[in-house]
UniProtKB/Swiss-Prot annotation:
SMART domains: EFP, Elong-fact-P_C. GO terms for molecular function: translation elongation factor activity. It comes from the Bacteria. It comes from Chlamydia trachomatis serovar D (strain ATCC VR-885 / DSM 19411 / UW-3/Cx). This is Elongation factor P 1.
Length: 185
């Protein structure tokens, strides 16, 4: 438990209505001299934002997360199946949680996840992954437009710009944060 006056942006709190991320916090003085803490909250796993008022000094339940390493297995209908490397449980993660991270997934990739009461609320890919080039442009097709680079389609479906010497079948290192080529492996 934390006091309402200790709430800060980025914290997660648990209420009877669910789990929320604190988006903004401000102190408001009431008519009778009472001070309230006005908080904008974003429902975990969605874009829905609500506003709540807490009395100054009111206790609020801070959500506790368990860090977990999960290994990606495969896509099953509209959910991604992972293996928890700590206890070997299977965990399904919906597409809404995966967002843009899904385009880098291939079997065997280990991700870092934050879990609250058995539910994954966020996950992070390794900063760098090694992926195989499935298709590339011919060197002359895109060189003039991109300053010496050509387009390459990777095994997961991601398209990146690569140097002209990269060929189909090469394994390259990609920065998952920027979707940029780093080096040939």
């Amino acid at each position: 438990m934390v006091l309402s006056s200790q709430l800060s942006v980025g914290m997660f709190i648990s209420t009877k209505d669910g789990l929320y991320k604190v988006v903004s916090v401000s102190k408001v003085s009431g008519n009778k001299g009472d001070t309230f803490i006005k908080v904008s909250l974003q429902a975990a796993g969605s874009d829905v934002t609500v506003e709540r008022n807490f009395k100054a000094g009111q206790e609020v339940k801070e959500a506790q997360f368990e860090p977990r390493n999960l290994e990606y297995l495969y896509l099953e209908e509209d959910k991604y199946l992972f293996l928890d490397l700590g206890n070997y449980d299977k965990i399904y993660i919906p597409k809404e949680i995966m967002k843009d991270n899904a385009m880098f997934l291939k079997a065997g990739v280990t991700v870092f996840a934050l879990v609250h009461e058995g539910t994954v609320f966020s996950m992070e890919l390794p900063h760098f992954l090694e992926l195989m080039v499935a298709k590339t442009d011919f060197p002359g097709d895109s060189l003039s437009l991109s300053g010496g680079a050509k387009k390459a389609l990777l095994e997961t479906g991601v398209e990146v710009l690569v140097p002209p010497f990269v060929e189909i079948g090469d394994v390259i290192k990609v920065d998952t944060r920027t979707c940029e080529y780093i080096q040939r492996v």
